[in-house]
Amino acid sequence: PERLPHGNNGLGLKLLGLSGDEVLPADVYQKLKAEALTQVRGTVQADILKEDQAQNTCIFSTEFALKLMGDVQQYFIDQKVRNFYSVSISGYHIAEAGANPITQLAFTLANGFTYVEYYLSRGMNIDDFAPNLSFFFSNGMDPEYSVIGRVARRIWAKAMKHKYRGNDRSQKLKYHIQTSGRSLHAQEIDFNDIRTTLQALYAIYDNC
C-alpha cells in the first residue's frame, strides 16, 4: 500500500467517514447533539397519502409508510425536535393531478386530520406533534386560490381548538405555496410569466 506523506497521520482522509461520537468525548457529543436537535430546522415531505392519491411513486405500503411517519414523529418528540417539520402535507401534487382548488384543500386537510388521528392512536399528545406538521398548496388561476390559505387556517384552527383541545401553537397551520406547473401552456408561452406572477400575487394577498 502507498505510504502517507511525512507528518500525515491519515486523520484528514477519515473525517468524511466519521461521526461526531468518534472524535469527541461522549458527554460533549451528547450535549452538542441535544442542543442541535432543539435548533435544527427543515422539513420531511414524506406524505404517503398524497402519494397514493396523486404522485404515485409509492415504494412501501400505506400501512408501513404510516408507521414510519409515526416513528419519525415519535423520535422528534423524544428528542425535543420542535423546529423541524416531520411531514409536509401536500396538496400541490393533488392539484397537479387535476383537482380544483376546493378539492385540493379538502383532500389535503383530510390527509392532515388522518395523520392527527393516527398519531393520537399511538399515544402521542396533540401539542407534542401538531406544531411539527406543515402544509404545501398549489396556486392557480381560479379565484378560489386567493383564499385557500385563509380557509385552510380557519378550518385547522377550529378543529385543533374545539375537537382536539390543542394549544395556541397547535392551532397554527403553517404552509407554503408553489405556483402551478399545470397552468402553464406551450401554446401561449409568452403569457406564462404573467400567469406565474398573478399566482404569486394570490399567495401574497392570502398571507402565505
What are these regions (language model features)?
Residues A157, S180-F191:
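Flexible, glycine/threonine-enriched loop-and-boundary segments that flank and lead into catalytic domains
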Residues S146-A152:
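Extended amphipathic alpha-helical segments enriched in small hydrophobics
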Residues P1, F191-C208:
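Conserved phosphate/anionic-ligand binding catalytic regions in large, soluble enzymes, centered on
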Residues P1-N139, E144-Y145, K163, Q171-Q178, ...:
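Catalytic alpha/beta active-site cores
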